Amino acid sequence: MRRFGSKFASGLASRCALACPLASAATAPAGASTTSSTSSAQKSFFKTTEMIGYVHSIDGTIATLIPAPGNPGVAYNTIIQIQVSPTTFAAGLVFNLEKDGRIGIILMDNITEVQSGQKVMATGQLLHIPVGAGVLGKVVNPLGHEVPVGLVTRSRRLLDSTLGKVDTGAPNIVSRSPVNYNLLTGFKAVDTMIPIGRGQRELIVGDRQTGKTSIAVSTIINQVRINQQILSKNAVISIYVSIGQRCSNVARIHRLLQSYGALRYTTVMAATAAEPAGLQYLAPYAGVTMGEYFMNRGRHCLCVYDDLSKQAVAYRQISLLLRRPPGREAYPGDVFYLHSRLLERAAMLSPGKGGGSVTALPIVETLSNDVTAYIVTNVISITDGQIYLDTKLFTGGQRPAVNIGLSVSRVGSSAQNAAMKGVAGKLKGILAEYRKLAADSVGGQQVQTIPMIRGARFVALFNQKQPSYFMNAIVSLYACLNGYLDDVKVQYVKFYEYLLVHRDLGIMYGTAKNKFFYMYVQELNYLIRFFTLNSPILHGELEEMLKQHTHLFLQHYQSKMNAIKSEKDVKALKNLLYSCKRAV
């Protein structure tokens, strides 16, 4: 064994990114320097590595091993090394232990170089990956290797000296705390009707090209605005896990996050369609491991899994290659456990455990709006609610295309603050009556009752291309709820909101009192006081401001819009309204 160690060590300086996490997990303390942990890990690795057999056969990304006589054995879910050359190794994960002694291995690295007859060494270590602040702002793969932005090859550099075990259990009941603090997405329809709390698991489900990824990425971007208003130690950390996506999609999302300054708080984990099925299977667990590092230190983390349908397909592929018995839709019998042990790791910890949280936003793709499919029903039963995106609403121009009737949040108003709760409570009743009246009047004359008038304007306010500020959403919905938009035509509702929430334009609407309002409306504490009985003066000023704004809007804008007749003016108006819709 010493002879093997000296022979292998000479060529492994560039390959220690994988060996170090595996071996140093049990010995390296948190926060140890990279140099010291690397050297000690190499020594520990070669002392504990033992040859256990040879590669017998290879089937895709699965290798079958024949144990050598007198081998010390190998444990399930541990890492093995296959010697593909005198100085190069391929990594694998023990995934099947058969009665005849054969061992099924998921290959994760250097797959094309693995051949029958090559020696296999056991490390005796579970998979560990780098975690901590060092992974923020980077694109990594499930093994913790940084991926260049071009996504052509992956480097072997160890990102951080702190390591986290990928396969861990979920926090127990005693360690958890009730979900009672909101995580704002920036979309009015979600934050009012389907609120998400920190520590919750909210499924995003819908057909292809209905905006599922858009909602998840926009939620990450919205956290940047919130992080800028709070202390850095309370900033929300985001982990975006891409499973089975095209490399171009991952690069596009990376550029989008970079343009909004979100990479400072975000890690992108990429297990693209070009990666082995084993890495696509491991990606969500590696992502939540990075999130748990921050949760255990009292921080708040958002994990997006895009999407779990492709992880289930990768797991099915692995199981079939390992000759495991297929079940419904050829998935193995433990596919439910595949997702439950992942999503149960999302939690809000109790104050005694630091008070940190991991919020999970899994994405699942449906086929022809079928929410009764196997994987879809499994994940729905695990999560605390779902946001259902409708193809008809999407093709009709609604953004986000949230079907409020089929969407639900089991946390409810307990994850909303006083301001949002005061608006959302009445809003739900109006929208429910609006949907009922709209369904009854299909093909006939619609009776213009208050629920019909305000419901149509609420739907217009819910249509937004990008996240909006929390305080702007509250004021807009409050104006609609109290009848200030009743006389505003539906096609001009977004223009009304645009002028209302922009300070530079809003100041043009009148008095010094309005100017004062726009100065302090940006303060969250003031906004919450609008909807309490503790500050009737501020509440009255808000009412007066909305009254003046509506009067001047109807007088100076809507009347002029109705008088427009020339094609040039109509085109200019359409461009103006389109730009306003995109802005809010």
Curated annotation (Swiss-Prot):
GO MF annotations, alphabetized: ADP binding; ATP binding; proton-transporting ATP synthase activity, rotational mechanism
Transit peptide: 1-24
GO CC annotations on file: mitochondrial inner membrane; proton-transporting ATP synthase complex
Function text: Mitochondrial membrane ATP synthase (F(1)F(o) ATP synthase) produces ATP from ADP in the presence of a proton gradient across the membrane which is generated by electron transport complexes of the respiratory chain. F-type ATPases consist of two structural domains, F(1) - containing the extramembraneous catalytic core, and F(o) - containing the membrane proton channel, linked together by a central stalk and a peripheral stalk. During catalysis, ATP synthesis in the catalytic domain of F(1) is coupled via a rotary mechanism of the central stalk subunits to proton translocation.
Pfam families: ATP-synt_ab (PF00006), ATP-synt_ab_C (PF00306)
The name this protein goes by in its record: ATP synthase subunit alpha, mitochondrial
Main location: mitochondrion
Keyword Nucleus: no
Binding sites annotated in the UniProt record for ATP: 207-214, 464
Site annotation Required for activity: residues: 407
Species this chain originates from: Trypanosoma brucei brucei
